[in-house]
Amino acid sequence: MTELQRVIKYLAIAFAIVLAVSIVFGIIGGIGMIFGLGKDGNDMLLEESIDINVSQAITSLDIEVEAAELKIVEGDSFSLSSNIKDLRVNEKNGVLSISQKHKNVTKIGIHTSKAGEIVLTVPSGVSFDKVEIDARAGDINISALVANKVSFDFGAGKVSIDHIEVTDWADIDTGAGMLAIGDGSIKNLDLDLGVGKTVLKASLVGRSDIDCGVGATELKLLGNREDYTLIVNSGIGSISIDGDYANGNSTFGNGANVVNIDGGVGSIDITFEND
């Protein structure tokens, strides 16, 4: 791919994301104003969060959030609370499924000031087989998560994960906003970034692919530099590895853990931190 082709590619990505968001909210607003469809967002919410019964034999999570704040916190046992009236909760074969029936929007398609909230408490030290989160809009805060496999599809909002451990594979896609991972270990990471800032501090085990979009990316790789092989393509932005800039297509190191980085539009800063 030539330099001009890379420029066109990443500018097209940025434009497509902005255009898609504008179209979605434009359609929602137009339908609401013309036909008067949709409830007031506050009618979809309770005055206070209520507790929802869940079993203690949960092995996987499947969460779909339309427009709400999602929190996953540590505690002594599994518990779930929410102020969303039409929240759907189902358990089957150890899989806890949580989804929203309606979006929290007004008749003109703008989110209300009163946000929906979902709080899932997970016992400290529990390990899931698979965790799937599909969040279209809203902030996500996860204190700690351990799983064999994770599949995250984040839309618009801020995502903060304090600690994460993935032992098999992880597939993470972001839209517009910020992604911050504070600590952990991730095996075979496939990270596809959209528009916004990303800060990732973790050990990356196996083979990882990071496709950067538009914005600044900070990778703080836990372990020694000798543990990694970095294969980088700077795109039309800049890549810094421990303060040294990499241009074009380059390979650094010969460690067992391979990280393939495709630069986008913006800066990528890679550093190493010993445990």
Question: Which role fits each region the language model picked out?
Answer:
Residues R6, R88, K101-K103, R136, ...:
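Arginine residue identity/basic-tract feature
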Residues G29-K101, H111-D134, D139-S151, S160, ...:
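Short linear S-[DN]-x-LW-Φ motif typified by the pepsin-like aspartic protease active-site region
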Residues R6-K9, I13, F35, D129, ...:
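Polar/charged alpha-helical tracts
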Residues H111, I161-I164, D168-D275:
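Short, surface-exposed interaction patches in beta-rich subdomains
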Residues T106-I108:
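Membrane-embedded segments
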Residues M1-G41:
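Gram-positive cell-envelope targeting signals
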